[in-house]
A protein has these predicted regions:
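Glycine-rich flexible loops
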Residues: 1-141
Length: 141
């Protein structure tokens, strides 16, 4: 899929997330890894939202390209991008090759789940079965 289409789709995901009222807090970020053909086969470049941009107003042109070579510099520039976003998304995109799109938000239910000692979501009923084998846990962060 071409980069411009991916960016428009990701911007729509931001707006839909706001519509669903799942944009609580300021430290939420979504990213999309570039298609290798559009990225000179560089697997670790991705687009991500800038800090402070309201999800309901997101446009494709608001998304910031993070190149693998820029990650160290961007970690020291919170005015450009949230350093936690660079760390989280950069690490996941480089370690989990199938993670082409990462949606990191602090929804009420995910926040509650994160307070438990065991933060995994066991497939114990119909509601949780929809996530069975569809969630990746990265325990070394």
């Amino acid at each position: 899929m071409k980069t411009d289409v991916l960016l428009k789709d990701l911007a729509a995901v931001f707006r839909w997330t706001a519509r669903l009222n799942m944009h609580e807090g300021i430290a939420n970020h979504f990213s999309i890894k570039l298609d290798q053909e559009d990225n000179n086969n560089n697997n670790n470049s991705f687009y991500i939202n800038r800090p402070g941009q309201h999800f309901s107003k997101m446009k494709a042109s608001d998304l910031l390209l993070v190149n693998e070579n820029d990650i160290d510099m961007l970690r020291d520039r919170p005015d450009i991008i949230d350093p936690t976003a660079v760390n989280i998304h950069g690490t996941i995109h480089s370690k989990v090759k199938d993670a082409n799109c990462i949606l990191h938000c602090h929804s009420k239910y995910a926040t509650i789940l994160s307070t438990f000692a065991d933060m995994t979501l066991p497939p114990i009923d119909q509601n949780t079965m929809r996530y069975f084998n569809r969630i990746t846990y990265y325990d070394d962060f």
